């Protein structure tokens, strides 16, 4: 099988490059991250500013940080100088939202992470407002609201999927549990180019990979995992995949021609898309119930193991052999509700909702942390932004650059 991961944004334009959800290839890998020669006893806070509430993760493009958050009741996009923490510009709009009582503790968002491409920053608000801004000055280029298109403009717990840019198209899954559409828009104009209406949106974000020379946009939907051709929206394949409360929420991980899938109480499985007699099918390679990932997505470490944070045992770091599904090692239990995982400079960094960052060797053969740091004084749900100069951490309301 011919397979590759497709780069979905512009190539590296500077040393630091983290333009979207989970980095340049949406896989948690930070090629520009350097890290210290030796991890110190404590990290230094170089700057810290108030940016607002929400789980949206910071991104980096055009030499600046972009943070999407809720500030004074308005969804606010801020551009921030990475050296000083100075806010360069902000753009905001009123964003009233009533959170489902089952997720009250998560606040009113936003949860979706922006994407930077071609001088534009795209945001997707918790109630389903999709916007394109100039990265230079924040000027609004275009905006889409879907109240006239769908009965609900967001899933039960609010929009959490992070849009993706592919070959001049911004692709987002709009709508809610009563119907939605995976839709492609022209990045410059916002004109709709295609839509797929086979299922409502999940809380998960897509990736793009190429199988048998055919690009696949792969994502979870409300009740399935599926792939469409990103140029046309043509459905290539779809598998039933349902979790409690219709809460599909992880990003599929591409590993050597297979997809690592998981969800709340769903275990972990590997499936392989195959083209047979002109039709696409997905063959299950293995499945394990010994771990399960929810509200976090694993990474593929340098030693070939998949490192993730299982919600079993009340939160536990695990390493899985992607060829067999065997758990090679696991960390201590009771580590938190969720974790954000990135890797680079020979280490895997695991950020838990308990505000801890565990530093592991990327080639570790057992759970043996190099360091464990407290990185915030409030819960951390957003993914960190790894830069050459340090790590940017978003907690409940603040954004901070931690260095060494």
Where are these regions (language model features)?
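Sec-dependent N-terminal signal peptides
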Residues: 3-12
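Noncatalytic, solvent-exposed loop/strand surfaces
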Residues: 14-404
């Amino acid at each position: 099988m011919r397979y590759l991961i497709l780069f979905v944004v512009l190539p590296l334009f500077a040393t630091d490059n983290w333009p979207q959800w989970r980095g340049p290839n949406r896989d948690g890998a930070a090629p520009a991250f350097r890290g210290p020669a030796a991890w110190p006893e404590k990290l230094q806070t170089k700057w810290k500013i108030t940016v607002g509430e929400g789980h949206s993760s910071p991104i980096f493009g055009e030499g600046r940080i972009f943070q999407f958050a809720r500030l004074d009741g308005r969804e606010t996009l801020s551009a921030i100088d990475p050296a000083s923490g100075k806010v360069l510009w902000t753009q905001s709009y009123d964003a009233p939202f009533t959170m489902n009582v089952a997720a009250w503790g998560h606040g009113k968002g936003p949860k979706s992470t922006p994407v930077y491409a071609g001088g534009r920053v795209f945001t997707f608000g918790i109630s389903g407002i999709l916007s394109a801004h100039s990265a230079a000055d924040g000027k609004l280029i275009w905006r889409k609201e879907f109240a006239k298109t769908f009965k609900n403009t967001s899933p039960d717990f609010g929009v959490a999927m992070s849009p993706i840019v592919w070959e001049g198209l911004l692709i987002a899954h709009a709508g809610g549990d009563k119907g939605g559409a995976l839709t492609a828009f022209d990045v410059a104009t916002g004109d709709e180019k295609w839509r797929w209406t086979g299922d409502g949106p999940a809380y998960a974000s897509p990736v793009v990979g190429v199988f048998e020379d055919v690009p696949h946009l792969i994502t979870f939907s409300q009740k399935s995992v599926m792939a469409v051709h990103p140029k046309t929206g043509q459905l290539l394949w779809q598998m039933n995949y349902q979790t409690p409360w219709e809460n599909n929420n992880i990003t599929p991980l591409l590993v050597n021609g297979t997809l690592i899938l998981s969800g709340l109480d769903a275990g972990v499985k590997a499936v392989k898309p195959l083209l047979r007699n002109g039709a696409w099918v997905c063959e299950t390679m293995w499945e394990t119930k010994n771990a399960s990932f929810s509200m976090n997505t694993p990474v593929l470490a340098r030693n070939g193991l998949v490192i993730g944070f299982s919600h079993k045992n009340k939160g536990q770091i695990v390493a899985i052999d992607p060829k067999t599904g065997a758990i090679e090692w696991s960390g201590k239990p009771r580590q938190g509700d969720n974790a954000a995982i990135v890797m680079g400079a020979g280490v895997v960094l695991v950020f838990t909702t308990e505000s801890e960052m565990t530093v592991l060797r990327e080639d570790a053969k057992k759970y043996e942390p190099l360091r464990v740091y407290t990185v915030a004084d409030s819960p951390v749900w957003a993914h960190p932004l790894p830069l050459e100069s340090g790590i940017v951490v978003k907690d409940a309301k603040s954004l901070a650059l931690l260095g060494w």
